[in-house]
Every structure is written in structure tokens, then in C-alpha cells.
Regions:
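Preference for protein termini
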Residues: 1-185
Length: 185
């Protein structure tokens, strides 16, 4: 039972049409969800992620035609990033014109390596809770932290290490090419 899925994602550089920060633009496809199911989902999410209560109304710009469950996905992604990366952002949620059931989510980020996985994890968590299944939240948060830590390691030191390894393998003496004198005949 797949209620929602991410059908497209793009990374936007800073100073884009939505934010001055770099953003992840995602298109979410959603099957209709009843109001009662959305209410149960919200209560389960609040129990699993108590910080979601603070995010209600702080999500940023939102279109009126967007179902509450899409806003819950966005709030969940923001809360997961806050818990895993200590990253607080506001986002944008809107409808995709002339495409019923598709919604645009824009989430600014500081750790690009964890932006898309955080949204994917949020959709998996929401799908699991809508279906009444459990979800290993601790493992997901640990994975997001690991992805963000990978970004923090300086690439310069990795390049120096790679260069040192290559230099130890490559012979130090210059290769001599045979000298070809022009023929005079």
C-alpha cells in the first residue's frame, strides 16, 4: 500500500526563487487520504516526534489547496533534520499546476548529503504510520547523522591522502623517451 512517493527531486543553488539558501525541490505524488486517517497520523507522529508540535504553523509559505498530510510530511522532514543535524529551516509547500495529486515541497538545507534522505525517510515514516506499521526512527536518525558527518570531513585532506598514496606507487624517476634524429637521405 503506497500512499505517497517522491517522483522528482532537484537541488537548487542559493538565491533561487524560493529562498536565499540552497534548497531541495521535490515533487510528491499522493493518493487521497481521509481526514480521520490524517488525524490518526498526526497523533502517531506527535507521539513519535514530540518536536512536531512546535512546527505547526512554522513551516513557511503554504498553498490552500495542499492537504494536511503533505504539510505533515514537510514538518516531519524538518523535524528529522533538526534531530539529526541540529538544522532548523522553513520551507514551502504548494500544488503542481494542472497535475492533481502532486505537490511541490521546497526545503532549504545546509547539509546537501542529508537533504534528500531526510525527505525520503519522512515519506517512509508517514507511509508506515498511515499503514499502521512500525518504523525504526533511531536507525534512520543515525543514518542521517552519518550522511551529514561525511559532508563535514574536509575534502582537502582527503585529496592530500590520495596524492600521497599515488606518489608512493608512481616511480620517482622521469621516464626517458628515445631520441629520434631526423633522417637525412
Amino acid at each position: 500500500m503506497l500512499l505517497m512517493k517522491i517522483i522528482d527531486q532537484r537541488y537548487l543553488e542559493s538565491d533561487n526563487r524560493y529562498s536565499t539558501q540552497p534548497c531541495l525541490l521535490s515533487i510528491l505524488e499522493l493518493e487521497p487520504v481521509t481526514e480521520a486517517a490524517t488525524e490518526r497520523l498526526q497523533q502517531r507522529l506527535y507521539a513519535a516526534l514530540p518536536g512536531l508540535r512546535r512546527l505547526h504553523g512554522l513551516v513557511g509559505k503554504r498553498a490552500d489547496e495542499v492537504p494536511a498530510v503533505v504539510e505533515l510530511v514537510q514538518q516531519t522532514a524538518i523535524e528529522l533534520r533538526r534531530l539529526a543535524l541540529n538544522e532548523v529551516t522553513l520551507g514551502f509547500v504548494g500544488v503542481v499546476p494542472r497535475m492533481p495529486g502532486r505537490y511541490r515541497l521546497v526545503l532549504p538545507y545546509s547539509a546537501q548529503s542529508a537533504a534528500a534522505p531526510a525527505l525520503a525517510m519522512a515519506t517512509q515514516l508517514v507511509n508506515a504510520m498511515l499503514a499502521g506499521r512500525s518504523f525504526n526512527l533511531k536507525a534512520g536518525l543515525a543514518r542521517l547523522r552519518a550522511l551529514a558527518d561525511r559532508r563535514r570531513k574536509p575534502r582537502g585532506s582527503l585529496m592530500k591522502t590520495a596524492r600521497t598514496l599515488l606518489m608512493s606507487v608512481i616511480p620517482q624517476r622521469a621516464l626517458a623517451l628515445p631520441f629520434f634524429a631526423p633522417r637525412l637521405s
